[in-house]
C-alpha cells in the first residue's frame, strides 16, 4: 500500500531531524521510501510562541496496513526523542499519516485522510513534488 507521510520538526537541528525520520522509514521492514519532497519552513499552528517548523512529505510503499504504518511512525517518533508535553507544542519530530492510497479511515486512533491536511500549507506543494517524475532530496 502507498502512503504519504508528513514529517515536521521545530526543535534542535531541524534538517537533521527530518533526515533521521526519513531514515527511520527506510529502515522499517517491508517498507520502501519511493520519493521525498523538498523541505519547507512553516509557521507553527495553534501555539505560536515557538520556532518555525521544517516540513516535508514522503511517499512510501509498505506491506503494512494503515494502523500498523501509524505504529511505525509513532515508534520512529519515540526513537527520535519525541515527548508529547502539550498539544501543538514544540516537537523534535512529528510524523503524520496523511494519505493511505484511496482509503478513508475513521477510528479513534487514526483518521485518513489526515483531518488537518487542508490547514497544512506545505502539504499540497509537497504532494505535487511527490507525484512529479523527478526525485527531490531531503
Put a short name on every predicted segment.
Residues 2-5, 11-86, 101-102:
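Nucleotide and nucleotide-moiety/phosphate-recognizing core
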Residues 67, 114-116, 129:
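Histidine (H) residue identity feature
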Amino acid at each position: 500500500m502507498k502512503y504519504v507521510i508528513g514529517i515536521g520538526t521545530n526543535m534542535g537541528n531541524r534538517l537533521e531531524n527530518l533526515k533521521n525520520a526519513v531514515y527511520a522509514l527506510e529502515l522499517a521492514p517491508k517498507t520502501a521510501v519511493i520519493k521525498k519532497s523538498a523541505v519547507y519552513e512553516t509557521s507553527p499552528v495553534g501555539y505560536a510562541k515557538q520556532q518555525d517548523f521544517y516540513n516535508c512529505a514522503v511517499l512510501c510503499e509498505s506491506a503494512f496496513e494503515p494502523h500498523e504504518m501509524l505504529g511505525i511512525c509513532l515508534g520512529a517518533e519515540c526513537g527520535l526523542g519525541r515527548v508529547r508535553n502539550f498539544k501543538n507544542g514544540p516537537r523534535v519530530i512529528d510524523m503524520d499519516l496523511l494519505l493511505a492510497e484511496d482509503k478513508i479511515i475513521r477510528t479513534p486512533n487514526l483518521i485518513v485522510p489526515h483531518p488537518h491536511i487542508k490547514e497544512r500549507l506545505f502539504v499540497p506543494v509537497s504532494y505535487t513534488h511527490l507525484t512529479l517524475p523527478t526525485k527531490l532530496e531531503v
